[in-house]
Amino acid sequence: MLKLRYKILFMKKINWVAGLVVLVVFSGCFDTVEEVTVADNGSGTFVNSLDMGKMLGLAKTMGSGKDEMKDFDKLKMDTVINLKDIKDSLKNLNAAEKNIAATGKLRIQMDANDEKMNFSFSFPFSKTSEIDGIQNILKKAKQNIIGDIMQKIMGEEGGKNESMLGNEDGDEKKDDMGANIDEYYTSVYEKGKFTRKLNKEKYAHVEDDKSLKSLQEMAQLGMAINMKTIINLPKPAKKAEGKGLKLSDDKKKITMEGTLDDFFEDASYFEYNIEY
């Protein structure tokens, strides 16, 4: 039986629907899309999206037949939240990082009946070198942000209940949300050049990464974890090298798609060298 990282305690004081939603959000089993759009002057937007639809469908199957599912199927929303409104609650960020986080927005789209659940973070940047900082902030605060939002949406039962998120005293430190493979690569975003190179020394110990290994087990059970990167350039690419890269006809859009299995089979698949 696959052991989930985040414990869900369906006690009487915890609303069943809220518990099920938290299970979906913090299971880590979801698809991710990162999209970078660069304007002529070097500014642009960075978007990180989490698609939890597959896990939501599995959760519905698990709860099939329960009376509470009638309430669960009614969950529906499409809302945008300015992160500046919650920046003070991001305790794991310093003051400078909070100011950057405050420039971002989070769009939540949920329709339980249609098995749709998406979280999409969007941040502006004035130059491409700022992308790395935005990614680091999301790595540190994404779970905290979504937990805070889930608490507001679901009430006291959602999001930040310590026992639900496996953060009681004595519990091991919470892992990052989802399949975070970025730490195994060195990425550089310069004017006119983007590169991503595998850290072979770190990757040699990937089998010790308990979080990724547990997600790999999920994938082997039929819950494939897809990862997609899209880069929209202001001009045609002069160079676009990488095993997983696809270049549009006008050479301005670069797409890379792969799975967690691809990462374990050949991590160089996610390397790239782009010049424009």
Give the label of every model feature segment:
Residues 7, 17, 35-36, 42-44, ...:
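A generic structural micro-environment signature
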